[in-house]
Design a protein with these regions (language model features):
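Short acidic, glycine/serine/threonine-rich loops at helix termini
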Residues: 26-28, 60, 86-90
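Acidic-glycine-rich active-site phosphate/pyrophosphate-binding loop
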Residues: 25-38, 76-82, 145-152, 206-218
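Flexible, glycine-rich active-site loops centered on histidine and acidic residues
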Residues: 67-101
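Claisen-condensing/thiolase-fold acyl-transfer catalytic domains that form or cleave C-C bonds
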Residues: 21-22, 35, 40-42, 47-70, ...
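Condensing-enzyme catalytic core mediating Claisen C-C bond formation in acyl metabolism
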Residues: 90-170, 174, 178
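Acidic, glycine-rich active-site loops and adjacent beta-strand->loop/helix elements
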Residues: 18-24, 50-53, 78-83, 120-122, ...
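Conserved active-site "lid/cap" helical segment
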Residues: 1-13, 140-195, 206-210, 214
């Protein structure tokens, strides 16, 4: 990408890395990426822990960092090895996910229009997608490494990610369409004039329901889900280039 853009490595001012599957507890993987890419030590490295909404959150963060003009060029790196976060014996959840990464380049431009965003947080539902142990609140014990049967084809450890599929589905159906409409109203956008609707690739059935609620034609709503599964924070950029 840098070669295609004609950007020298020494011109990168900041990298923003978004992931739920960092290499280590410490240090931030963003710092390791700076070294692996051979970027200068003057490059600011920031790491954001986010999943489904990660690319949008990262894009907002990277754009905000360069908007003032002090930092000129940014790389937004989004990637997850989601399959490693789930039990290999959880046949209900693990097959839904794929591993992927993306890189988005941003550059300060004095005549560029401002990027507009609609954000929100619902912290009360944090257990809808949840890994019970492994952080500082609940340290791993020997018992947490034992597999527990939760149902047919569902063997998980406490260190494995769990997902309340029905709650996630209900959230997507109720919140996503309203969020898009609020964005359109806030910035006076005519959704009928939009070229594409790129949705996080969580569930085809759910996304089709959202598409219909927003009156987007099928050809304006691309998918990468069939080929790559749910690729977490990378799903939107993966869909854009697919």
């Amino acid at each position: 990408m840098l070669e295609d853009l004609g950007w020298g490595k020494d011109t990168i001012d900041v990298i923003v890395f978004v992931s739920s599957s960092a290499d280590y507890v410490v240090p931030p993987t963003a710092c390791i990426i700076q070294e692996e890419l051979g970027l200068p030590e003057t490059c600011l490295s920031i790491e954001i822990k986010h999943g489904c909404s990660g690319w949008v959150v990262g894009l907002n963060s990277a754009a905000s960092l360069i908007m003032g003009g002090c930092l000129k060029r940014a790389l937004l790196l989004c990637g997850d090895t989601s399959t490693l976060l789930h039990s290999p014996f959880d046949k209900e959840t693990r097959p839904l996910f794929g591993d992927a990464g993306s890189c988005t380049a941003l550059e300060f431009d004095t005549i560029a229009s401002t990027l507009e965003f609609e954000h929100g947080t619902r912290g009360k539902d944090f257990k809808s997608i949840y890994t019970p142990v492994g952080g500082c609140r609940n340290a791993v014990t020997a018992k947490d490494l034992e597999f527990i049967e939760y149902g047919p084809n569902q063997l998980r450890r406490n260190i494995d990610c769990t997902m309340d599929g029905m709650n996630v589905f209900a959230f997507g159906m109720s919140v996503a369409p309203k969020s898009v409409k609020r964005l359109a109203e806030k910035y006076v956008l005519n959704l009928e004039q939009m070229d594409y609707l790129f949705l996080h690739q969580a569930n085809h059935y759910m996304n089709e329901k959202i598409r219909k609620k927003l009156n987007f034609a099928p050809e304006k709503t691309p998918y990468s889900l069939r080929d790559f599964g749910n690729t977490s924070c990378a799903s939107i950029p993966v869909t854009i280039i697919t």
